[in-house]
Amino acid sequence: MKILLLCWRDTTHPQGGGSERYLEHVARYLSDRGHEVIYRTAAHTDCRRKSVRDGITFYRGGGKLGVYPRAAIMMLLGRCGIGSLKDVDVVVDTQNGIPFFGQFFSGKPTVLLTHHCHREQWPVAGKLLASLGWFLESRISPRVHRNTQVVTVSAPSKQDLISLGFPPDNITIIHNGVDPIPATLPQLEDDGRIH
């Protein structure tokens, strides 16, 4: 299968974090099982527009907000058989407050991935952007994705999504994992001078 993952950042982004790491683990898992995985994300300083890491092809374009229209254009082109997103079989749309509306633009089956509701985070974006973002997250996304499979990482996040209007039966919880402890840990020689 050709699988498209959409996320506003990746782990090479200076502000990338846990959500991006989670999605890259999913991408690596899918790639290791023979799937073609494309990760579409925002560009950032000194990044390459296209790179391949762990069998995942990363395409970067747009900034903090520009990533959304850039991804939409690429999905529409792919829908017309043009570009790197042609022949995509399924989309994983990561909603970090704002979804990519991958189902609408790609015309392909889509899974919506969201770690949590961003109600408390929106005010730091400024009044106008916060109002628009919260409107998209709380009003538009639940309606657009009412028949979409939704994945989240905890029971409280599921309850938040239900309170926004997502159908409970469409929400699956897949808990975050942890990396295994290394077999050996690097150690410094203790000569009594290290405190």
Residue spans for each PLM region:
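Conserved donor-binding/catalytic core segment of Leloir-type glycosyltransferases
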Residues: 151, 189-195
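N-terminal strand-loop element at the rim of the active site
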Residues: 9-12, 29-65
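Membrane-proximal helix-turn-helix segments that form the acceptor-binding/catalytic region
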Residues: 129-151
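Active-site proximal beta-strand in glycosyltransferases
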Residues: 2-3, 90-93, 105-123, 130, ...
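Nucleotide-activated donor-dependent transferases that construct or modify glycoconjugates
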Residues: 1-15
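Carbohydrate-associated surface elements
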Residues: 156, 174-177
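Short N-terminal targeting/anchoring amphipathic segment
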Residues: 59-62, 76-100, 105-106, 111-112
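Short amphipathic alpha-helix
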Residues: 17-30
